[in-house]
């Protein structure tokens, strides 16, 4: 198993699949990284040499934001939107969809589960 940017990549996977385990790297970016470093995408991670691993690591660090740095940037951007009080920041703060989706009938993921209603049973009047 190779360690790239602080993440252990599974050794039995092909390089392009294993690189997608990094936060911020999808299939397209993985192929781009391997193309620029000159490594065969179908090569297994366990077959990579130390030199190839360091090549990939250096390329990623020089050209992309991944893992913690990317997460920090995203959180900082959301916090900035909230601080300036814009509409998008307000939607983030309320936990509602930010990009104009409807909320009357959908958006359950963002809004969370429906509030449960408390059902009260009526006492039956006893006739004596």
UniProtKB/Swiss-Prot annotation:
Q: What keywords does the record list, in alphabetical order?
A: Ribonucleoprotein, Ribosomal protein, RNA-binding, rRNA-binding, tRNA-binding
| Gene3D superfamilies in the cross-refs | 1.10.8.50, 30s ribosomal protein s13, domain 2 (4.10.910.10)
User: Where does it sit, as one GO cellular component term?
Assistant: cytosol
Chain intervals with Basic residues compositional bias = 101-128
Origin superkingdom: Bacteria
Keyword Protein transport on entry: no
- Tell me which Pfam families the record gives: Ribosomal_S13
Stretch list, region Disordered: 97-128
Picking any one GO molecular function of the record gives: rRNA binding
Which BP terms from GO are recorded?
A: translation
Query: Does the record's keyword annotation contain tRNA-binding?
Result: yes
- Protein family membership: Belongs to the universal ribosomal protein uS13 family.
Subunit comment: Part of the 30S ribosomal subunit. Forms a loose heterodimer with protein S19. Forms two bridges to the 50S subunit in the 70S ribosome.
Q: Check the record and name the HAMAP family matching this protein.
A: Ribosomal_uS13
What is the role of the protein in this entry?
A: Located at the top of the head of the 30S subunit, it contacts several helices of the 16S rRNA. In the 70S ribosome it contacts the 23S rRNA (bridge B1a) and protein L5 of the 50S subunit (bridge B1b), connecting the 2 subunits; these bridges are implicated in subunit movement. Contacts the tRNAs in the A and P-sites.
Q: Which PANTHER family match?
A: 30S RIBOSOMAL PROTEIN S13/40S RIBOSOMAL PROTEIN S18, SMALL RIBOSOMAL SUBUNIT PROTEIN US13M
Its recorded name reads: Small ribosomal subunit protein uS13
According to its UniProt entry, this protein's organism is Pseudothermotoga lettingae (strain ATCC BAA-301 / DSM 14385 / NBRC 107922 / TMO)
Organism classification: Bacteria, Thermotogati, Thermotogota, Thermotogae, Thermotogales
Q: Which gene encodes it?
A: rpsM
């Amino acid at each position: 198993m190779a360690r790239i940017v602080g993440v252990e990549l599974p050794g039995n996977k092909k390089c392009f699949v294993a690189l997608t385990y990094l936060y911020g790297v999808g299939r397209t970016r993985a192929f781009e990284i391997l193309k620029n470093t000159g490594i065969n995408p179908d090569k297994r991670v366990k077959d990579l040499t130390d030199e190839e691993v360091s090549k990939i690591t250096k390329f990623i660090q020089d050209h992309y934001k991944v893992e913690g740095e990317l997460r920090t940037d995203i959180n900082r951007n959301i916090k900035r939107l909230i601080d300036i009080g814009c509409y998008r920041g307000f939607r983030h703060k309320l936990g509602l969809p930010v990009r104009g989706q409807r909320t009357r009938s959908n958006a359950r993921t963002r809004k969370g589960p429906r509030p449960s209603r408390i059902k009260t049973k009526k006492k039956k009047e006893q006739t004596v």
